[in-house]
Swiss-Prot record:
Organism per entry: Clostridium perfringens (strain 13 / Type A)
SUPFAM superfamilies, sorted: YbjQ-like
Protein name (database record): UPF0145 protein CPE0882
Family according to the record: Belongs to the UPF0145 family.
HAMAP family on file: UPF0145
Annotated coiled-coil segments of the chain: none
Length: 106
């Protein structure tokens, strides 16, 4: 599955637009790692546990979006975007969305 943030696929033509596809996940912090990150917040530096959570959330959301596109028979997703939001204390949502298409050689 080709996943692009662009509107077009260089050297290819869009044969059919399948529609909007999306994937999301809500991730919570681990209390032990959260305490360690709180100390890091005091002295500065990267909060590795939060970076890991966001990386995992992106991968899951994109994977779910790709699964939805494949179920529609698409072979690419164009105009893919990622959005994150804080839902509650210690929880964050990651959403991936884009347009599922079938492309062919131009």
């Amino acid at each position: 599955m080709l996943v692009l943030t662009t509107e077009t696929i260089p050297g290819k033509g869009i044969k059919e637009v399948k529609g909007l596809v999306k994937g999301s996940t809500v991730r919570c912090k681990n209390i032990g790692k959260d305490i360690a990150s709180s100390f890091k917040n005091l002295v500065g530096g990267e909060m590795n546990s939060y970076t890991e959570i966001l990386t995992e959330a992106r991968q899951i959301a994109i994977g779910r979006m790709v699964d939805e596109a494949e179920s529609l028979g698409a072979n690419a997703i164009i105009e893919m975007r990622l959005v994150s939001s804080s839902l509650a204390a210690g929880a964050a949502e990651m959403v991936a969305y884009g347009t599922a298409v079938i492309y062919e050689d131009a």
